[in-house]
């Protein structure tokens, strides 16, 4: 077993095209850690330390602040990925239902399905650039919230320092927009 000292990465949706890439897990901050090894009914716990890069004058508190911020951004990115998966599932359920009923579907139900599809598509398009089918498409179409969150993550993870004020402000704005979109999706799924 080898640990690369990184936290687990964010969830991802296969096939998505992102300009800024997917969000990986941040590297653990310097400090004291324990590893527990198990084999059958035997186990042993071993302590170890992660040391900061001596080329930087970064304090352990600064490293902790960076890691905590990166975990927050990673978790918000994961929420977006889960929402995109949920949208695909809802869309598939609507398609399956429509196919089962076929031509006999009452007009009122067909209109409701169309309305829900339009609503979830609007949320999906705010979360992800759905027109991006290749790496170059993101040059032609604006990036959306998932890609913007990945950009903030990348900026804040560069170097061994606390996140900049700009990164924190950008994240706060993006998190508010993301939460609004996720709230819309939740309302659509639960009420419609």
Q: What residues fall within each predicted segment?
A:
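Generic beta-strand/beta-sheet core signal
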Residues: 4-6, 36-38, 51
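Short acidic/polar inter-strand loop motif in beta-rich domains
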Residues: 7-13, 38-46
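Generic recognition of flexible, low-complexity loop/linker segments
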Residues: 21-24, 34-38
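Glycine-centered tight-turn motifs at strand-turn-strand junctions
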Residues: 1-26
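Mature extracytoplasmic or organellar-lumen-exposed domains after removal of signal/transit peptides
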Residues: 32, 48, 79-192
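Low-complexity, Pro/Ser/Thr- and charge-rich linker/hinge segments at domain boundaries
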Residues: 45-81
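Active-site-proximal structural scaffolding
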Residues: 26-30, 41
């Amino acid at each position: 077993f080898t640990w690369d000292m990184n936290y687990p990465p964010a969830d991802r949706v296969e096939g998505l095209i992102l300009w800024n890439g997917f969000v990986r897990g941040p590297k653990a901050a310097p400090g004291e850690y324990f590893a527990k090894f198990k084999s059958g009914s035997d186990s042993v716990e071993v302590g170890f330390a992660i040391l900061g890069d001596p080329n930087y004058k970064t304090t352990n508190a600064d490293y902790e602040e960076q890691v905590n911020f990166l975990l927050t951004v990673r978790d918000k990115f994961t929420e977006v990925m889960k929402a995109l998966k949920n949208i695909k599932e809802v869309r598939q359920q609507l398609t399956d239902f429509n196919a089962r009923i076929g031509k006999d579907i009452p007009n009122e139900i067909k209109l409701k399905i169309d309305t829900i599809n339009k609503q979830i598509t609007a949320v999906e398009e705010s979360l992800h650039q759905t027109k991006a089918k290749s790496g170059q498409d993101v040059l032609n179409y604006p990036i959306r919230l998932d890609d913007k969150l990945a950009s903030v993550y990348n900026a804040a993870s560069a170097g061994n320092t606390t996140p900049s004020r700009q990164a924190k402000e950008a994240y706060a704005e993006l998190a508010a927009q993301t939460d609004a979109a996720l709230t819309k999706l939740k309302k659509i799924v639960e009420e419609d």
